[in-house]
Structures are given as structure tokens and as C-alpha cells.
Amino acid sequence: MSYPVTSQPQSASTCYQTQLSDWHTGLTDCCNDMPVCLCGTFAPLCLACRISDDFGECCCTPYLPGGLHSLRTGMRERYRIQGSIGKDWAALTFCLPCALCQMARELKIRE
């Protein structure tokens, strides 16, 4: 015996609001951590490889085209930091040492 369907199933929608935060330190706060500042200034690729490794990615990621950009964007996504891909691109293109230092400081604070 079959029964006719008298009502359609309703879709359940759950809306989660996520609170976005800011970077713990500013882009130009390089001197807050002098060892990171010196490494970012004189050996930025070494710092980039360390950041990548500390973030759980392959240490060769910074050498790939767009690798640093995806790393910074991934960091923003994981830690729910406000920003955009365009701002990530601008920071890494026009102020690479400062952006790397900011990323390294953020990892130190969050980990």
C-alpha cells in the first residue's frame, strides 16, 4: 500500500556568521621582531621558505609562480583575517619584505 506525498520536504538553511579579525601586527611593524626583520630584509626567500614550512606547506611553495600569494591568502583564510586577494597581491608585490615579516609574526602569535 502506498501513501501519496502531501507535503514537499523543506530545505534547511543554516546561516553561520563568522567574525573576521585583523592581522595582529601591521604591515610596517617590521621592527617588532628584529630577527624576523633582519631575515626578511637580507634573506627574504629563506624567510618565505620558513613561513611555508611552519604553515604546513612544502618549503618550495615560495618558488612556484603565485606561491607566496596563495600562501598569504591561505593564511588569511585559515585565521579568518580580513582582506582580499588584491590586497595580498599588492602587499607582496610592492612591499615583499614587510609582507613576509608580517606573515612570520602572525604565525608566531597564532601557533
Curated annotation (Swiss-Prot):
GO BP annotations listed: keratinization
Subcellular location: Cytoplasm
UniProtKB keywords: Cytoplasm, Keratinization
A GO CC term attached to the entry: cytoplasm
InterPro entries named among the record's database cross-references: PLAC_motif_containing (IPR006461)
Transmembrane segments: none
A Pfam entry, by short name: PLAC8
PANTHER family with a match to the protein in the record: DUF614 FAMILY PROTEIN-RELATED
Subunit-level organization: Directly or indirectly cross-linked to CE proteins loricin and involucrin (IVL).
Primary role: Part of the insoluble cornified cell envelope (CE) of stratified squamous epithelia.
Homology family: Belongs to the cornifelin family.
Protein name: Cornifelin
Source lineage: Eukaryota, Metazoa, Chordata, Craniata, Vertebrata
Gene (name only): CNFN
